[in-house]
């Protein structure tokens, strides 16, 4: 007997499964990673700070990220909040690809940008607003595909490009790139008008540079904007963007695939293998567990759990000076250092 699952329930179950899987991944690979990130950022509850930040390109996601990160002093909070955002990104990406291609064959590949973003969160120099900006971009693409009129879609895209640059920053470049790819397959003869959005983003970036909001072009147009300015971003920061562009290029070809069960099954299996290989090969490359013990100790310090620090240090080698400092600090707080 065939069991029919209502669509809302199916979406909820898919989101819940993804949420649990991502939460488990974060917990296994670095339970105290997000707690460590919280100690490097401070959210200032001041009207002048909020207003000044909000007026800058990307100010909205920067304020939202700062507000969320303050809850990361509880290790589980950072894991659950980030897993929630990445699960939403996966569902939106799946919905966009399905609505655009007319089939649901690319849902395994929709995990690729999610995995890439998950890797970025283990880099302490990655800015949390990068994930929020990515989510906001997908929201724009979702509504774009709901508009049938070509002219209305372009007007909406123009307005949302300006809105996205103002609220989320350089992610507007990726938004315009994906829009051009989408429209090139939907309306090939009319997609040239979307090239004007490139000029719009360029002018917005130029204005931001004139105002001194950005110091370099790469911070106004590329993914480097979501990496700390103190260090060069490297190629890893461009991974989610590059994967997304490649995914949409492949998605355009999937629009013309014949609906054959054997072919569909083979494509799903191949995509599953690709995602598995990417996760298996990327985890050791982008995730380091060398400092996990130190992150755990700093989290305990942040929460004033001095007895827990002393007990934890009994089970770890004390040749590491950072571990020694944490141990001595706990003893000092307990007034036991001289003893």
Show the residue positions of the predicted features.
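Membrane-interface micro-motifs in multi-pass membrane enzymes
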Residues: 36-39, 54-58, 78, 82, ...
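Membrane-interface coil-to-helix junctions
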Residues: 24-78, 85
């Amino acid at each position: 007997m065939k069991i029919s699952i209502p669509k809302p329930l199916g979406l909820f179950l898919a989101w819940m499964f993804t949420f649990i899987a991502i939460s488990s991944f974060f917990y296994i690979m670095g339970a105290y990673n997000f707690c460590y990130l919280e100690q490097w950022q401070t959210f200032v509850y001041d009207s002048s700070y909020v207003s000044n930040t909000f007026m800058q390109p990307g100010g909205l996601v920067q304020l939202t990220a700062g507000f969320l990160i303050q809850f990361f002093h509880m290790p589980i909070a950072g894991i659950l909040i980030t897993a929630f955002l990445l699960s939403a990104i996966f569902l939106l990406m799946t919905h966009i690809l399905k609505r655009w291609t007319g089939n649901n064959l690319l849902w395994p590949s929709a995990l690729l940008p999610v995995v890439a973003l998950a890797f970025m969160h283990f880099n302490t120099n990655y800015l949390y607003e990068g994930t929020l900006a990515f989510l906001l971009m997908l929201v724009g693409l979702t509504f774009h595909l709901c508009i049938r009129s070509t002219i209305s879609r372009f007007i909406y895209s123009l307005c949302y490009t300006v809105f996205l640059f103002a609220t989320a920053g350089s992610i507007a470049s990726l938004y315009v790139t994906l829009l051009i790819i989408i429209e090139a397959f939907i309306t090939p003869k009319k997609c040239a008008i979307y090239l004007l959005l490139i000029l719009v983003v360029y002018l917005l970036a130029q204005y931001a540079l004139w105002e001194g909001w950005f110091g370099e072009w790469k911070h106004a147009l590329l993914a480097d904007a979501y990496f700390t300015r103190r260090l060069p971003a490297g190629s890893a920061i461009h991974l989610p963007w590059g994967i997304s562009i490649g995914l949409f290029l492949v998605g355009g070809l999937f629009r013309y695939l014949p609906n054959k069960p054997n072919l569909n099954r083979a494509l799903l299996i191949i995509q599953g293998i690709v995602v598995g290989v990417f996760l298996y090969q990327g985890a050791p490359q982008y995730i380091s567990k060398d400092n996990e013990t130190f992150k755990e100790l700093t989290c305990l310090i942040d929460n004033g759990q001095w007895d827990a620090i002393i007990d934890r240090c009994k089970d770890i080698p004390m040749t590491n000076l950072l571990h020694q400092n944490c141990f001595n600090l706990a003893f000092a707080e307990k007034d036991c250092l001289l003893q």
